[in-house]
């Protein structure tokens, strides 16, 4: 007879540590930070996926700071306003005036990919492109923070009292595009973002294969359930790493015209179908295939597709039923009653599946209705989709339990759309925080707004709950504008153009890059050298002979100001 198994003490200790970690994760999830967060997995699942060596991440601290910032804005009815930072100079300048930083995939795609190959925003660059830019900017933030500390702690208390402190460590929110593939790709992307310094990440509900800039045509959505899986994958990775990275869920449902699949019932009400029975058994894909076999191409194929779509009379199933009710042989009062019953039974928030909708229609006397969502599918197999704010609301409600902030991409700065989305989402998720893209793709001057309207736009939208508002590409446009106008003037007027447009403007506005050696940290590394060499260095960069001494005096030329006045401005 075998003796009973004795569990070694090391095994018991291992299990004890594991169970303690499970309890720790459960307690963490029970904090106010995750009060609104839903997870389809357990704390034990997270602990099983962690290693034994606990790591900490600077981005974790920045994520907590970002969360506090956004919640404060939510409580105050205000918004964090920011824009896409292009480089370390911009991120350092932004720190003086803004409380968050954005890193745009569009800007990275056009200016800073991992392969150095520029292009439009199709998310076809290597997936470490945006994380690399995050690290580029985060390292700059850390450096300027160190540099400032050395400078301030080398001053007297009286000097520090007159020198404004700049918080260079502003939380970075980064563009995660569509997650760059399946769940494992999203997990690895989010891990990179945490390691590189991102405090927040946004993921959008477009197909990763056909991803487009939110202001381009041809956008293809994934099913609601697929994007929920992306958000869950991101949250799981953040949980594994023990960070509170802010997760932003973006939907492109307002302007999307296609969707990958009809598998999710929440999408059914927005999918378009052919209503012309003459096209029965003549799908668009088959017609185009036959035309290509006959040698048609280019404009001829486009003309064939346009004609087919016009003949098909595409409608949502709900619109098709409404038209059928209007055509019934019944009194106007009876028709109105049936329309009201249909609207009540199939409202957007109910997300009624197609088969159930057919049963409801039949109960109202609408039978033998021809409506086919497969006939108009594209050659790639995509379904036709009617984008709308209502579709965005349905998706926002589905994403809310899995994300911290919700973002509806729009095609214009439309207060009515902002209001409808905010009210629709917050009816189901009252505590939801919202984001808004103050896009440079909008022609703001053609929006019908006055200058006063534009000035008030951010505060007005903030009062609706949009706590984070950002101009995605302002860094790009500012860089282009300054460079183009200066280059043109420099070609014409030479050094006077530089002095007037750059040097004097830096001086009069107190921009510290006027003394670029100091700004870049020459004094900081002189301190390093002197520390290494016992307090002295004959090769100090800012020693006797440095040309920046010229900027410490007074100027009497045109456009000049005294150094004391410049210093005062720099401290404002």
Curated annotation (Swiss-Prot):
It is found in: Glyoxysome. The active site is at 213 (proton acceptor). Mg(2+) binds at residue 175. Substrate binds at residues 104-106, 214-215, 250, 437-441, 472. Keywords: Glyoxylate bypass, Glyoxysome, Lyase, Magnesium, Metal-binding, Peroxisome, Tricarboxylic acid cycle. InterPro entries: ICL/PEPM, Isocitrate_lyase, Isocitrate_lyase_ph_CS, Pyrv/PenolPyrv_kinase-like_dom, Pyrv_kinase-like_dom_sf. Its main location: other. Its cofactor is Mg(2+). Pfam families: ICL (PF00463). Residues 550-572 are annotated as: Disordered. Pathway: Carbohydrate metabolism; glyoxylate cycle; (S)-malate from isocitrate: step 1/2. GO terms for biological process: glyoxylate cycle; tricarboxylic acid cycle. One of its GO terms (molecular function) is metal ion binding. A motif (Microbody targeting signal) lies at residues 570-572. It catalyses: D-threo-isocitrate = glyoxylate + succinate. One of its GO terms (cellular component) is glyoxysome. Belongs to the isocitrate lyase/PEP mutase superfamily. Isocitrate lyase family. Involved in storage lipid mobilization during the growth of higher plant seedling. This is Isocitrate lyase. It comes from Oryza sativa subsp. japonica (Rice). The lineage of its organism: Eukaryota, Viridiplantae, Streptophyta, Embryophyta, Tracheophyta. The gene is ICL.
